[in-house]
């Protein structure tokens, strides 16, 4: 119980009571201007950023009517001469920097402490590190549940989550003001615009932080109940959702379950259960009976309804048998397939053939969604026939080839873990012919005539030789190991985000 108390109790040293004065410091906005992110695009107003604008903005904020820069109905503020939304963006960026500094270290430390991955943290940051884990664990499990994290969440719930970490009242007034302003300005946080809200081009870091905060709160409760509360009865878990004095309620309920109950429900006692999430999709795999994983299904539904006030139907969580179902995760189709092998055993003058069936994880490249993504990017049509890229025809030959090669390398890098390379070769073929047709379009010729003019069809052979050249730096070019690796699965642990074309499906 002491461990549970230490886990849940919010220590006063973590509370931040003086965040609001940071919004009046010029260094915060300078940091916001120079602080980029690999996950979001440039919002476009950094070019307009200047120290003079920040000084004027801070001077205006010191006045009692500083929020007139937001409430003015005109497009440009008469005091400063700039668009009102531009100034709200500057303050919002400073707001995001303050909360990112506050929570980034806490999230990192709690994750490292929970999963004990301090030494190998750099490698496990890769999203491809999950696939070797799947190869080792999924073959021993029976059931898989696809969980789509529901949305939208009420804005006040986000404020309540932050209240457990921050005690600055002025900070929350400003946060509620941002919610109200952007809700009225863009009609955001509606069900139809949830994705465009949290990954908005105008406010990507702010809404991405809020979304991560929401997911972190939901997973912290889930993991705590999974790891620490194996003796609690199912009918009591609704009262856990008030975070204040959480550990006291758990202590009381443990005593009740021990004294008044002659048995313990095995709801939380699944030692062969694994939970994986990337962005808004989660996967729960288990070895136990369907009844147990079905209980977890309704646990998630009640958690979202009671703690986050989000209505989620039972049909949104699907439970499937791994032996009969393939699921989609991080751009791959994953399935468990039996692998039949025959072993000849000879004893004295008698020989026997022993058939062994072992399970293995199949990782397949989803060719149809990828062709759809390539067609959307104008590299081919909907049937997969390569076409030229007209918008690149004005570039130099070197730039055209370099852009196509970069895309092809990203595909090869991301999908080199596929068990079957036929689909990957098809994607390379589409990109290779699209590059040739783009070059032919630039030189006002056909693809066939363009290749004949060069006198050889070895043009762009890098599309097919990159992996072989990479492996030849480690193994001899004629070695069996090189050939086996070239056709086998290789997981790269330097991939931190999904491929751009994978994000389209």
From Swiss-Prot:
Q: Using the record for this protein, list the coiled-coil segments as residue ranges, or answer none.
A: none
User: What keywords does the record list, in alphabetical order?
Assistant: Chloroplast, mRNA processing, Plastid, RNA-binding, tRNA processing
Q: Does the keyword Plastid apply?
A: yes
A GO molecular function assigned to this protein is: RNA binding
From which domain of life does this come? Eukaryota
What Pfam families does the database record attribute to this sequence? Intron_maturas2 (PF01348), MatK_N (PF01824)
Which InterPro entries did the record assign? Answer: Domain_X, Maturase_MatK, Maturase_MatK_N
Quick check: keyword Cell inner membrane in the entry? no
What processes in GO biological process is this protein linked to?
A: mRNA processing; RNA splicing; tRNA processing
* Any one cellular-component term (Gene Ontology): chloroplast
Q: Where would you say this protein principally sits, based on its record?
A: plastid
The places in or outside the cell where this protein is found are:
Plastid, Chloroplast
* TM spans (from-to): none
Which PANTHER family does the record match to this protein? MATURASE K
**HAMAP family membership:** MatK (MF_01390)
Q: What is the purpose of this protein?
A: Usually encoded in the trnK tRNA gene intron. Probably assists in splicing its own and other chloroplast group II introns.
Q: Which family does it belong to?
A: Belongs to the intron maturase 2 family. MatK subfamily.
- The protein in question is named Maturase K
Tell me the organism.
Glycine max (Soybean)
Gene of this entry: matK
């Amino acid at each position: 119980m002491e461990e549970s108390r230490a886990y849940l109790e919010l220590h006063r040293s973590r509370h931040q009571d003086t965040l609001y004065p940071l919004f009046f410091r010029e260094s915060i906005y300078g940091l916001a201007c120079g602080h980029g992110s690999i996950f979001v695009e440039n919002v476009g107003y950094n070019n307009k950023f200047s120290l003079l604008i920040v000084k004027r903005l801070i001077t205006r904020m010191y006045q009692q009517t500083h929020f007139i820069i937001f409430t003015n109905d005109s497009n440009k503020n008469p005091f400063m001469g700039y668009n009102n939304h531009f100034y709200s963006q500057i303050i919002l960026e400073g707001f995001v920097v303050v909360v990112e500094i506050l929570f980034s270290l806490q999230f990192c430390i709690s994750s490292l402490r929970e999963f004990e991955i301090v030494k190998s943290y750099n490698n496990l940051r890769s999203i491809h590190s999950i696939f070797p884990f799947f190869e080792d664990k999924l073959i021993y499990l029976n059931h898989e549940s696809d969980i789509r994290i529901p949305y939208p969440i009420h804005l006040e719930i986000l404020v309540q989550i932050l209240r457990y970490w921050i005690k600055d009242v002025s900070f929350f007034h400003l946060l509620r003001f941002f919610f109200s302003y952007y809700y009225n300005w863009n009609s955001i946080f509606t069900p139809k615009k949830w994705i465009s809200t949290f990954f908005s081009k105008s406010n990507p870091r702010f809404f991405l932080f809020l979304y991560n905060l929401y997911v972190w709160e939901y997973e912290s409760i889930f993991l705590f109940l999974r790891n620490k509360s194996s003796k609690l009865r199912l009918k009591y878990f609704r009262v856990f959702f008030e975070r204040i004095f959480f550990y006291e309620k758990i202590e009381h309920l443990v005593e009740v379950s021990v004294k008044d109950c002659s048995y313990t429900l095995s709801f939380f006692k699944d030692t062969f259960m694994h939970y994986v999430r990337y962005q808004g999709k989660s996967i729960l795999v288990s070895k136990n009976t369907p009844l147990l994983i079905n209980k977890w299904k309704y646990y998630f539904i009640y958690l979202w309804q009671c703690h986050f006030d989000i209505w989620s139907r039972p049909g949104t969580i699907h439970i499937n048998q791994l032996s009969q179902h393939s699921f989609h995760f991080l751009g791959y189709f994953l399935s468990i397939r039996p692998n039949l092998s025959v072993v000849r055993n000879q004893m004295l003058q008698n020989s026997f053939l022993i058939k062994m069936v072992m399970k293995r994880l199949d990782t397949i490249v989803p060719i149809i969604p990828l062709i759809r993504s390539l067609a959307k990017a104008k590299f081919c049509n909907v049937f997969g026939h390569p076409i030229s890229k007209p918008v690149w025809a004005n570039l130099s030959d070197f730039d055209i080839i370099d852009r196509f090669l970069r895309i092809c390398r990203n595909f090869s890098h991301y999908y080199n873990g596929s068990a079957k390379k036929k689909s990957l070769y098809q994607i390379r073929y589409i990109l290779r012919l699209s590059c040739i047709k783009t070059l032919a379009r630039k030189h006002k010729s056909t693809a066939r005539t363009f290749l004949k003019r060069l006198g050889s069809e070895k043009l762009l052979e890098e599309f097919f030789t990159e992996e072989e050249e990479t492996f030849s730096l480690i193994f001899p070019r004629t070695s069996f190991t090189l050939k086996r690796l070239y056709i086998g699965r290789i997981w790269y642990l330097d991939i931190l985000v999904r491929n751009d074309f994978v994000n389209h499906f």
